[in-house]
């Protein structure tokens, strides 16, 4: 089992990153790949997901993120893609609060989460996340700023691709696109966070 990979970011796409270590490039799916900058040195905490038709590495900037991901995978109806979309929201405190308060209306805002799955998340995880992630705080996923060198148009397009990769529909993306265009030049990561804030309202 690979606990983490420490190396250099070789490639960043809307769905995954490639981190090079010892001449080997590891393809790792992450909640928001654009928080990483090419050629930066990173430590990625990994989860090896193996099923009959799938063999993939999922990676996170902190062990807490990884633990939340594994908890989400234990919920019936939540797969890796759904768990990544929830983690990409950038506000784990709000997610945990929604689970503890049985706020189904908040949970169904995530792509792929309907009322039945939201209820299952609450049934399976209520009262259990605090023990799994004792140090969790509302800004857990607000990672250290990584400077982005992108023109605004390119960053916005990458952000829209990232939203599609997370499972948001073109209709949902078109709703937030005008708001994003009004923003001053942002990095791809910042555009994604702004979009998720709008989508989860």
Swiss-Prot record:
Keywords: Cytoplasm, DNA damage, DNA recombination, DNA repair, DNA-binding. It is found in: Cytoplasm. CDD domains: UBA_RuvA_C. GO terms for cellular component: cytoplasm; Holliday junction helicase complex; Holliday junction resolvase complex. Residues 151-201 are annotated as: Domain III. One of its GO terms (molecular function) is four-way junction DNA binding. Pfam families: HHH_5 (PF14520), RuvA_C (PF07499), RuvA_N (PF01330). Its main location: cytoplasm. Residues 62-140 are annotated as: Domain II. Residues 141-151 are annotated as: Flexible linker. NCBIfam families: ruvA. Homotetramer. Forms an RuvA(8)-RuvB(12)-Holliday junction (HJ) complex. HJ DNA is sandwiched between 2 RuvA tetramers; dsDNA enters through RuvA and exits via RuvB. An RuvB hexamer assembles on each DNA strand where it exits the tetramer. Each RuvB hexamer is contacted by two RuvA subunits (via domain III) on 2 adjacent RuvB subunits; this complex drives branch migration. In the full resolvosome a probable DNA-RuvA(4)-RuvB(12)-RuvC(2) complex forms which resolves the HJ. Has three domains with a flexible linker between the domains II and III and assumes an 'L' shape. Domain III is highly mobile and contacts RuvB. The RuvA-RuvB-RuvC complex processes Holliday junction (HJ) DNA during genetic recombination and DNA repair, while the RuvA-RuvB complex plays an important role in the rescue of blocked DNA replication forks via replication fork reversal (RFR). RuvA specifically binds to HJ cruciform DNA, conferring on it an open structure. The RuvB hexamer acts as an ATP-dependent pump, pulling dsDNA into and through the RuvAB complex. HJ branch migration allows RuvC to scan DNA until it finds its consensus sequence, where it cleaves and resolves the cruciform DNA. Belongs to the RuvA family. This is Holliday junction branch migration complex subunit RuvA. It comes from Bacillus licheniformis (strain ATCC 14580 / DSM 13 / JCM 2505 / CCUG 7422 / NBRC 12200 / NCIMB 9375 / NCTC 10341 / NRRL NRS-1264 / Gibson 46).
């Amino acid at each position: 089992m690979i606990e983490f990979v420490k190396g250099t970011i070789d490639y960043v796409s809307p769905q995954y990153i490639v981190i090079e270590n010892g001449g080997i490039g590891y393809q790792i799916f992450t909640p928001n790949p654009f928080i990483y900058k090419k050629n930066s040195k990173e430590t990625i905490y990994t989860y090896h997901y193996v099923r009959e038709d799938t063999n993939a590495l999922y990676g996170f900037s902190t062990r807490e993120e990884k633990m939340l991901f594994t908890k989400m995978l234990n919920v019936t109806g939540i797969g890796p893609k759904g768990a990544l979309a929830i983690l990409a929201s950038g506000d784990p405190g709000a997610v945990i609060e929604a689970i503890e308060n049985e706020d189904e209306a908040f949970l169904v805002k995530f792509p792929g989460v309907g009322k039945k799955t939201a209820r299952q998340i609450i049934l399976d995880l209520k009262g259990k996340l605090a023990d799994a992630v004792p140090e969790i705080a509302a800004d857990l996923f607000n990672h250290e700023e990584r400077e982005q060198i992108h023109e605004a148009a390119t960053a916005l397009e990458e952000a829209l691709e990232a939203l599609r990769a997370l499972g948001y529909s073109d209709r949902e993306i078109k709703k937030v696109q005008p708001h994003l265009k009004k923003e001053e030049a942002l990095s791809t990561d910042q555009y994604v966070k702004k979009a998720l804030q709008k989508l989860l309202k």
